[in-house]
């Protein structure tokens, strides 16, 4: 939910900035988003990590007990990748099985990791240049990860 909240905030801020820059007097209505905008933000903010569904499964691993020196089984999560596909691409593929995504939504979900996932800096940059929503979704994901959910 943090990514959705961050994405909505970023989108409203960017929309406000664009209105202010254009010099039109729409400031009062700028924070009102259309139903289509609200749906797009929900789709991207909530479904960008659909690829993680059933990806992590409960398991155990052995850890040496510091006090006794004995090995003990402790619960953990392991990876069970039933669909070895890229992170962003896999989410687009999964979501597309249930609903039609606009090109902008597909690009935002695909590139929400930026070029971190597979090192495709050139393609990520091209997508960010063409689809503002892709940039905002990536930023929202980073904010949620490092500002809202950081446990360190």
For the regions a language model picked out, list residue spans one by one.
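Divalent metal-dependent catalytic cores for phosphoryl transfer on phosphate-bearing substrates
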Residues: 12-150
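Glycine-rich active-site/cofactor-binding loop and its immediate structural neighborhood
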Residues: 2-7, 11
